Amino acid sequence: SAQMGCVRLSERIMRSNPATAEEVTQADAYVAEQLARVRADVPIGSTRTLVGCAGTFTTLSALAQGLETYDSHAIHGSVLRFDALRVLTAQLIRESSEQLSINPVIHPGRADVIAGGAVVVNGIMTLLAEEADVHTMTISEKDILDGIIAELAGE
């Protein structure tokens, strides 16, 4: 597990609301550093499918689809293109938590950390595009623990 979650970035680096350009640059550098550590242990180049699980990823899917309310059926299994996501993440990084909280698909507890999540997603997209020629992401309502349990159960 890499230490680069949206809460960590928001609390430690992206403290302004919205984050300053300098804070975003620092957050980008931090995420790149963490992803470099991941690359040392994970064969990124052999990745064929990127699955974004829960949290920031499901929120991005709801926003990208223009949903008026959070709809887990529309979100789970949705496929998002990196080019469209980059436009969306840039918008999320620019807006204040007050602006973001107006959107009904952004959970109230996520409005103040979603910009940090957007920085993480940008870093992941850059890495996968460059090293594995992956340009889409499939969204899952499930999280990593569901996957671990399924694997242990032999599913």
Language-model segment annotations:
Residues S1-E155:
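Helical "lid/coupling" subdomains associated with nucleotide-phosphate turnover
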